[in-house]
UniProtKB/Swiss-Prot annotation:
PANTHER family: 30S 40S RIBOSOMAL PROTEIN (PTHR11831), SMALL RIBOSOMAL SUBUNIT PROTEIN US4M (PTHR11831:SF4). This is Small ribosomal subunit protein uS4. InterPro entries: Ribosomal_uS4, Ribosomal_uS4_bac-type, Ribosomal_uS4_CS, Ribosomal_uS4_N, S4_RNA-bd, S4_RNA-bd_sf. Part of the 30S ribosomal subunit. Contacts protein S5. The interaction surface between S4 and S5 is involved in control of translational fidelity. NCBIfam families: PRK05327.1, rpsD_bact. Residues 98-161 form the S4 RNA-binding domain. One of the primary rRNA binding proteins, it binds directly to 16S rRNA where it nucleates assembly of the body of the 30S subunit. One of its GO terms (cellular component) is small ribosomal subunit. GO terms for biological process: ribosomal small subunit biogenesis; translation. Belongs to the universal ribosomal protein uS4 family. One of its GO terms (molecular function) is structural constituent of ribosome.
Length: 208
């Protein structure tokens, strides 16, 4: 399945949760989900009872759409998490959090992961002093992630930094906002990552 490129607010209403896909509207409390917290369509307000498989599938979709990954990428990450020692679900979330586009978003250089992905692919981001244009690039603890010199006055990046200053920055990155760089200090603990996803259902789905 390819990466979702359709109307993001309709997707959030269908899944019933905010996926942080609309930055400024979400921060301003103007998202479609807040105004109409039910699925789109004629019968949207009457949510059908969901099966166990449907629940497992929904949790996978929420994670995929939130982090902006394809089915192939997601399955590959799950397989890697399953091979490692530890809690597979927590390790999956950790691997998703290490994606470069997500780290750019977490550092506050973009209001959404979608915009962060664009910044990466268009060459606006450096990792340890080198330009990296692959959104799925894995950022290792201790890495320096910065906005390229030519892009530091980009109005969208400046606006994003101003907006995310209202919401704060996660504990596993240190950011110098004025200089527009940050350090990915460590991998987060699962309980630190606040996302509306119950990854145990994803583990159940892929374990069948």
């Amino acid at each position: 399945m390819a990466r979702y490129t359709g109307p993001v607010e309709k997707l959030e209403r269908r899944l019933g949760v905010s996926l942080a896909l609309k930055g400024e509207r979400r921060l301003a409390g103007k998202s479609a989900l807040e105004k109409r917290p039910y699925a789109p369509g004629q019968h949207g307000q009457r949510r059908a009872k969901i099966s166990e498989y449907g629940l497992q599938l929904r949790e996978k979709q929420k994670a995929k759409f939130m982090y902006g990954v394809s089915e192939k990428q997601f399955r590959r990450l799950f397989q890697e998490a399953a091979r490692r020692e530890g809690n597979t679900g927590a390790l999956l979330v950790q691997l998703l959090e290490q994606r470069l586009d997500n780290v750019v978003y977490r550092m506050g250089f973009a209001t959404t992961r979608r915009f962060a992905r664009q910044l990466v692919t268009h060459g606006h981001i450096l990792v340890n002093g080198k330009r990296v244009d692959i959104p799925s690039y894995r950022v290792e603890p201790g890495s320096k992630v910065e906005v390229a010199e030519k892009s530091k006055n980009n109005p969208q990046i400046v606006r994003a930094i101003d907006l995310t200053a209202q919401t704060g920055i996660v504990a596993w990155v240190d950011v110098e906002k004025e200089k527009k760089f940050g350090i990915f200090t460590r991998n987060p603990e699962r309980e630190e990552v606040i996302i509306p996803v119950e990854e145990r259902f994803i583990v159940e789905l892929y374990s069948k």
